[in-house]
């Protein structure tokens, strides 16, 4: 009986997958239905459950938060109509909208805010609200947040723009489904402009317009409902397959357009290729739990082995800028350029070899260094084709100094699991951030094992980060970020990788897309796809 049920279940899932795949292909030509191609797959729609970009992208559409930033970084009301801060900076009181409903039909109240913030404090992204002591309900539409210490960044940390961790789920749905909330499609209930209707993992996500939505923030011209009736997000990991789907108009948008295909597609009538600078923080990370990487000289040797210009040319086809620090140059709080130039390891393979010699790694047979009988052999874990191309360039550069690296391309979920179980030797991670806070908390002790999957735990690093979160002096806060960055570079915690552009291919049938410089499609309230 059990076997028969399992067979039926698998058959149903396969049928649903085929329906979604076929419907997505048809929908790309349908008005009011937006079909998006993306290279990674979502795995959880519980806000704050993890920091995976596919989850965050969809959660922007499913949920709202108390406040939100516009496309220029200005803060605006969302589920909160207004707020007040006490003179000592420790108490924030929010007046909530009273006209908001969840997708379940239940009214949104202060109890939902308290429930999510209380839960968030135990989630992997809890460092974002480290300052939060407690949440009190004053009445159905008034909530009060008490902080452990005053901070300049509390509103930023609870803005939906800061990765949608603060999106408020339906507390009753969370209670009903428990650990399955955000994992089962039927569990998800937010207040956002779109409702989750279908979800086949690693294949497609189908969202429908929330017809009751009328409380959109003023960052959009349209307060709701959305103009689009349906949004389908297709997972297409292979770059060539995604570009082909775009070219055949099986998808309307490729949100992660291949830099190899961009020049060719740019000349196609009706198809726009958008290359937009982003605040990206991409890094190669050493697993500091592994003995090989516990010697600072070894880590610095590998930093000197990296030729950033070659990576930009080969892996990114010129659509990137060589890294000159951990933070991108346009990021507030980065170490001044002239100071970073004094400490940032330049490409110098001779110096890299010298440092390895000094660290006791001597050249052995097959041009592979050995120390205490252990070869300088390791694996770089990646999860996209572009990352694999980049890692292949690094592979050749590292071989020149006597290392024997392998590259392991994995499905994103498997990569995440490997990070949490610290099986990796070295990993590549790409990220886009709206603030220096968003990139920094990955490298503090309390973020181990995720998102601090380099397992770096250092008292000074934590002190600098704490200053950024607790000082009430903006100049001191930015200076602390600079010292945080200095520490990462001087201790060779990671190897910064080139800062990339947002590469998007979009057909001219899509109107008023208004891409966000960090989050891309963002909330899609103004976007249209009218019929021909």
Predicted regions and their residues:
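N-terminal lobe/hinge region of extracytoplasmic solute-binding protein
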Residues: 37-87, 118, 189, 505
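Gly/Pro-rich hinge or "lid" segments in bacterial periplasmic/extracellular proteins
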Residues: 72-74, 161-232, 240, 348-358
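Ligand-site clamp/hinge motif
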Residues: 119, 213-264, 386, 395, ...
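Structural transition elements
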Residues: 194, 287, 322-365, 383-389
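Extracytoplasmic/peripheral linker and loop segments enriched in polar/acidic and small residues
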Residues: 345, 354, 405-415, 440-508, ...
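Long beta-strand-rich cores associated with HINT superfamily self-processing modules
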Residues: 504-532
């Amino acid at each position: 009986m059990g076997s028969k049920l399992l067979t039926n279940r698998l058959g149903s899932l396969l049928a649903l997958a085929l329906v979604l795949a076929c419907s997505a292909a048809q929908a790309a030509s349908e008005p009011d239905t937006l079909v998006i191609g993306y290279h990674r797959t979502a795995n959880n729609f519980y806000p704050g459950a993890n920091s995976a970009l596919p989850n965050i992208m969809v959660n922007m559409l499913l949920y709202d938060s108390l406040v939100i930033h516009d496309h220029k970084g200005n803060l605006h009301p969302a589920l909160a109509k207004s707020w007040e801060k006490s003179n000592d900076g420790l108490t924030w009181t929010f007046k909530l909208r009273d006209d908001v409903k969840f997708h379940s039909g239940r009214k949104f109240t202060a109890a939902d805010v308290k429930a999510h913030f209380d839960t968030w404090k135990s989630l992997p992204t809890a460092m974002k609200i480290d300052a939060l002591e407690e949440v009190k309900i004053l009445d159905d539409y008034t909530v009060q947040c008490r902080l452990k210490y005053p901070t300049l960044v509390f509103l930023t940390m609870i803005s939906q723009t800061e990765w949608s961790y603060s999106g408020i789920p339906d507390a009753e749905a969370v209670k009903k489904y428990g650990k399955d909330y955000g994992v089962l499609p039927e569990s998800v209930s937010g207040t956002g402009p779109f409702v989750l209707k279908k979800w086949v993992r690693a294949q497609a996500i189908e969202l429908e317009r929330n017809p009751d939505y009328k409380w959109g923030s003023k960052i959009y011209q349209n307060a709701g409902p959305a103009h689009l009736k349906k949004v389908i997000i297709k997972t297409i990991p292979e770059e060539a397959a995604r570009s082909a789907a775009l070219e055949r108009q099986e998808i309307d948008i490729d949100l992660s357009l291949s830099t190899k295909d961009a020049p060719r597609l740019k000349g196609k009538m009706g198809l726009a290729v958008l290359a937009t600078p982003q605040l990206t923080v991409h890094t190669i990370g050493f697993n500091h739990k592994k003995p090989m990487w516990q010697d600072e000289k070894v880590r610095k040797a590998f930093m000197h082995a990296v030729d950033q210009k070659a990576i930009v040319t080969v892996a990114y086809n010129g659509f990137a800028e060589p890294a000159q620090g951990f933070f991108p140059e346009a990021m507030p709080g980065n170490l001044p350029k002239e100071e970073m130039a004094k400490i940032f390891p330049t490409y110098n393979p001779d110096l890299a070899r010298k440092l390895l010699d000094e660290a006791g790694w001597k050249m052995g047979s097959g041009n592979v260094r050995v120390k205490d009988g252990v070869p300088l052999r390791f694996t770089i874990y990646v999860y996209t084709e572009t990352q694999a191309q980049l890692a292949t360039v690094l592979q050749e550069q590292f071989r020149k100094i006597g290392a024997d690296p392998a590259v392991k391309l994995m499905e994103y979920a498997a990569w995440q699991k490997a990070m949490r179980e610290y099986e990796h030797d070295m990993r590549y991670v790409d990220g886009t951030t709206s603030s220096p806070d968003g990139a920094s908390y990955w490298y503090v002790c309390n973020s181990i094992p995720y998102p601090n999957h380099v397992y770096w735990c250092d008292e000074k690093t934590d002190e600098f980060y704490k200053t950024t979160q607790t000082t009430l002096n903006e100049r001191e806060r930015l200076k602390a970020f600079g010292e945080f960055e200095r520490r990462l570079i001087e201790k060779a915690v990671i190897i910064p990788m080139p800062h990339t552009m947002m590469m998007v291919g979009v057909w001219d049938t899509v109107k008023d897309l208004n891409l966000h410089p960090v989050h891309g499609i963002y909330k899609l309230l103004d976007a249209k796809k009218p019929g021909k």
